[in-house]
Each structure stands twice: as structure tokens, then as C-alpha cells.
Amino acid sequence: MNPNYLDFEQPIADLEAKIQELRTASAGPSVNVDTEVRALENKLRLRTAQIFRNLSAWQISQLARHPRRPYTLDYISVVCDEFQELAGDRTLADDKAIVGGLARIGHRPVMLIGHQKGRDNKERLMRNFGMPKPEGYRKALRLMKLAERFGLPLLTFIDTMGAWPGIDAEERNQSEAIATNLIEMAELKIPVICTVIGEGGSGGALAIGIGDRTLMLEYSTYSVITPEGCASILWKDAAKASDAAEQLNLTARRLKEFGLIDKVIREPIGGAHRNPQQMANRLKAVLLNELEALDKVPLVTLLNQRHKRLRTYGAYENH
């Protein structure tokens, strides 16, 4: 099976292969298979729509991790008319799992920060599989405070399995770096829009996920733990990940129903990786609309609403 297809997409892969075979066969001048190709293309559209209308939480989790899914830098190349990356936390290093910088979207100057994964093994290692270390979150915080200083709206793109759990990260106080970002983002005196574009994993996602609007792409996920991690803890069996995915309620639709996010951004049929350009243009339009709406909210009201929405997530009681 083509590695760009997931298991549940096998019927789609088969139809696309048949269409390609017919097109190859019709390369000669005496062969005309246009009618057959059109019939198969229509069948393909209907079958794809049917499959993607009935996706399970586990299947959506797989789509959120698809190796061809657009990452932060892919969206930046389309959404932003200009982008100047800024590097380093000014303390230790430049964590490549977090990218960020000054950007312009249309006429709007913004600060943009996001997780970044890799396409091949070399880049995955360089990006640490999109799992930031403390210096990544401290770089993000530096850019957030820079945005606040210059009155720039902050946009974040979330796509990580979670924060890096290695000993080196713990030695540099990973939990403190995440906690500091949560505190600081809650008080930023600028509009903040957070968008989950792939995986939203635990505190590693939340460390750039506190804002005035939380958006999710249709086939993204947001959860305290991966389905495999949850299954390993609850049932001592990672093979039960599909059951865990259902119990975690990690899909955009479910989180919207719970009132934990503000908007679900529809993806092209088949997922964002099937038409990255269309997905990026759709995301750009939504972000510009949300920025325009937040422009009309006074700063005091903005902060009060941000604090109120954080309190609706739940409360901790010490008995």
C-alpha cells in the first residue's frame, strides 16, 4: 500500500490506482477511455466523501499525524505575505522544534509562533520530532513578550505530540518553562489566536495554546495524552489506542461541543494534505476574520474574557 494512504483509505487508493492505469493506457492515440475515467472519478468522489463522513476518533488521530500533512512552515509560506524568522531563547540555544518570527498577513503585522516537525529522518532529528525542549518554550516566550512590546497580535500554530520528556529537558526545568508560558500568555496585553493544525499534545501544546480564540482544523486533535500513551496506562496495551481515542474525546467536533474551542475549520475532503494550498487559504481567511473581530474588543474586556474562559476549563480544589 502507498505509504501516503492510511489503512482506512484503501478503497480510495484502489480507485485512484485504477484511474491512473486507465490514463496510462489511453496514452496512445487510438484509445479513448474518457467515459470510464469520468465514471471512476465520480465514484471516487462519492466514496471519499462517504469514508470521511464517518471517521472514528482513532482515524482522525491518524490523519492529524499524516506524514504529508502541512506543518507550520508550510502554512507560513502561503498564509503570510512576509515572514522573518527570529531564533534563540537568549539563554542557551535555538530549539528548531519551535519556529517563530515577525509576519505580515495581508496588511496585518503579527507575531507568529508554531511547532515544527520534519519530513525526513534528518529533519525530524533536527526538529526533535516537533517536541520542544525548555529553550524552545523560552524562545516562544521571548517572541510573545516582543509582540506585546510592539502591540502585535500573536498567532500560534500547535502541532506536537508533547514536550520533550528527556533527561536533558528535565535538567533545564521543562515544567517551569511550560508553567511560565501559561502564566505569561494569560496576561499578554495583545490579541492571541491559537490554532491546532495537527496534534495538540498535553502541556507541550498548551504552552503556546492560551489565547482569546482557540481554533482547530477539522482533522486535528487536542488531548492531555496520546491515545497510545493512554492505552498503555489504562490497559497496559498500546494496541487499545483506538478505544482510548474514543474515550479521550480529542477531536475538534467533540471539543467544540464541550465549549473548549471556538471554531472548527473545515478541511478539504481527504484532509489538509490532499490540498494544502486550499487549506492554507481557508486558514488565512479565518485568521483575518478573527483578528478583525478581536480589534473591536477593548483590552480590559479581552483580558477578562481570556481569564473567564480559562476558568471554564475546570478548577483545582485542595481537600
Curated annotation (Swiss-Prot):
GO BP annotations, alphabetical order? fatty acid biosynthetic process; malonyl-CoA biosynthetic process
Query: What are the entry keywords?
Result: ATP-binding, Cytoplasm, Fatty acid biosynthesis, Fatty acid metabolism, Lipid biosynthesis, Lipid metabolism, Nucleotide-binding, Transferase
Q: Name one GO cellular component term.
A: acetyl-CoA carboxylase complex
Pathway annotation from the record:
Lipid metabolism; malonyl-CoA biosynthesis; malonyl-CoA from acetyl-CoA: step 1/1
Q: Could you state a single Gene Ontology molecular function term?
A: acetyl-CoA carboxylase activity
Pfam families associated with the record: ACCA
* Gene3D superfamilies on file: 2-enoyl-CoA Hydratase, Chain A, domain 1
Q: How does it assemble?
A: Acetyl-CoA carboxylase is a heterohexamer composed of biotin carboxyl carrier protein (AccB), biotin carboxylase (AccC) and two subunits each of ACCase subunit alpha (AccA) and ACCase subunit beta (AccD).
Q: Which family does it belong to?
A: Belongs to the AccA family.
Matching entries from HAMAP family are given as:
AcetylCoA_CT_alpha (MF_00823)
- Name recorded for this polypeptide: Acetyl-coenzyme A carboxylase carboxyl transferase subunit alpha
**Annotated source species:** Xylella fastidiosa (strain M12)
Identify the coding gene: accA
